[in-house]
Swiss-Prot record:
Keyword DNA damage: no
This enzyme's EC code(s): 2.8.1.7
InterPro entries associated with the record: Aminotrans_V_dom, Cys_deSase_IscS, Cysteine_dSase, PyrdxlP-dep_Trfase, PyrdxlP-dep_Trfase_major, PyrdxlP-dep_Trfase_small
Function, in words: Catalyzes the removal of elemental sulfur from cysteine to produce alanine. Supplies the inorganic sulfur for iron-sulfur (Fe-S) clusters.
Organism: Arabidopsis thaliana (Mouse-ear cress)
Binding site for [2Fe-2S] cluster: 377
Protein name: Cysteine desulfurase, mitochondrial
Activity regulation information from UniProt: Threefold increase in the catalytic activity in the presence of FH (frataxin). 30-fold increase in the catalytic activity in the presence of SUFE1.
Record family assignment: Belongs to the class-V pyridoxal-phosphate-dependent aminotransferase family. NifS/IscS subfamily.
């Protein structure tokens, strides 16, 4: 119960307008550091002037660091500054103990052994290490990888890199709801399949894959199963044993921890082998050489500890906000489509397409709300999302998609404001759309034969 009260208090603290309370009422120096002047008349951002700081609804790209995580990191920075790999003096031992405590915290969150946790720089490195590392180690007998068309770019690019080396890759399509066809997966497995890599929660559409069923299929065929769980840990219950995963990638900054640190779960029994990407001092059981980033690792552990305590409360809070956002938009707008399954979905992700609206114009018009049109790694591209195309979404609807990311510190007031601004901008753009006028008049625009010029 105490953690619920703390989380709610921090939510109010981080979103309360500047000037309405004094610094002495902050919970910590970390909370005080987040103080922002929301009363600024306007802010110039990349040549665009907006009225004050935008609302932050891009939690799949990254989350704000939890002040309690920051406090843990700050204390560690002051007191545990030794090299965790220095085994000859107290300062090294203190730093090593801090790292091992964090390793335990991460392991508990996913029901693993601390000896199965390898700290890395983030999920991208973990994905590269898993996909390339396994296939390189077993290259003499295993030449085939299975993944899906909706994976994160770093997994897809790792697979393409393997193809250039002579490996074969099967890119499974997904159903219109974003879920994997289990029979298609079963049929794709070959005697020389060395790895199946399927993400647990999709970063763009929030779809949660049937992990236990996928893991069971892989186990039946004795094929290692890797999952990118960057969007899953701390948000949905994760159990590596129930999922039958051999490798799992994780990231701290998706769960209110620091950027620059993540982990790869590497199963010990039955043992999975992989070739390291980097060579050096042999840290992290020889799988990831280099001096560990003690304070980031401490922050990762603290974030995992908080996630264990607050996941259920967070899920209920965020679910209510998701429903508030979706209902609020649909009450005032027609032609709003949810991309991806609503039955098997992480509640903090709401990917919506707005018919008869040009996507880039909608994003630019929503400059007072920090949202995205897809993955932060590819959102600079003007091409429609490859994830939505894989779902069979029409190109025009894929172009109009907006991903709303809701999190632990999001408030009802922010959701209401986001609804207001979104509805206002969509209505404005539709007023300028001749296609929308034709639809309102009952014309089926898909059957129109447009003249060639």
């Amino acid at each position: 119960m105490a953690s619920k009260v703390i989380s709610a208090t921090i939510r109010r603290t981080l979103t309360k307008p500047h000037g309405t309370f004094s610094r002495c009422r902050y919970l910590s120096t970390a909370a005080a550091a987040t103080e922002v002047n929301y009363e600024d008349e306007s802010i110039m951002m990349k040549g665009v002037r907006i009225s004050g700081r935008p609302l932050y609804l891009d939690m799949q790209a990254t989350t704000p660091i939890d002040p309690r995580v920051f406090d843990a990191m700050n204390a560690s920075q002051i007191h545990e500054y030794g090299n965790p790999h220095s085994r000859t003096h107290l300062y090294g031992w203190e730093a090593e103990n801090a790292v091992e405590n964090a390793r335990n915290q991460v392991a508990k969150l996913i029901e693993a052994s601390p000896k199965e946790i390898v700290f890395v720089s983030g999920a991208t490195e973990a994905n590269n290490m898993a996909v390339k590392g396994v296939m390189h180690f077993y290259k003499d007998t295993k030449k085939h990888v299975i993944t899906t068309q909706t994976e994160h770019k770093c997994v897809l690019d790792s697979c393409r890199h393997l193809q250039q080396e002579g490996f074969e890759v099967t890119y499974l399509p997904v159903k219109t709801d974003g879920l994997v066809d289990l029979e298609m997966l079963r049929e794709a497995i070959r005697p020389d399949t060395g790895l199946v890599s399927i993400m647990a929660v999709n970063n763009e559409i929030g779809v949660v894959q049937p992990m236990e069923e996928i893991g069971m299929i892989c186990k039946e065929h004795n094929v290692p199963f890797h999952t990118d769980a960057a969007q899953a840990i701390g948000k949905i219950p994760v159990d590596v044993k129930k999922w039958n995963v051999a490798l799992m990638s994780m990231s701290a900054h998706k769960i209110y921890g620091p950027k620059g640190v993540g982990a790869l779960y590497v199963r010990r029994r039955p043992r999975i082998r992989l070739e390291p990407l980097m060579n050096g001092g042999g840290q992290e059981r020889g799988l990831r050489s280099g001096t560990g980033a003690t304070q980031q690792i401490v922050g990762f552990g603290a974030a995992c500890e908080l996630a264990m305590k607050e996941m259920e409360y967070d899920e209920k809070w965020i679910k209510g906000l998701q429903e508030r956002l979706l209902n609020g938009v649909r009450e005032k707008l027609d032609g709003v489509v949810v991309n991806g399954s609503m039955d098997s979905r992480y509640v903090g992700n709401l990917n919506l397409s707005f018919a008869y609206v040009e996507g880039e114009s909608l994003l630019m018009g929503l400059k007072e709300v920090a949202v995205s049109s897809g993955s932060a790694c590819t959102s600079a591209s003007l091409e429609p999302s490859y994830v939505l195309r894989a779902l069979g979404v029409d190109e025009d609807m894929a172009h109009t998609s907006i991903r709303f990311g809701i999190g632990r510190f999001t408030t009802k007031e922010e959701i209401d404001k986001a609804v207001e601004l979104t509805v206002k901008q969509v209505e404005k753009l539709r007023e300028m759309s001749p296609l929308y006028e034709m639809v309102k008049e009952g014309i089926d625009i898909k059957n129109i034969q447009w003249s060639q010029h």
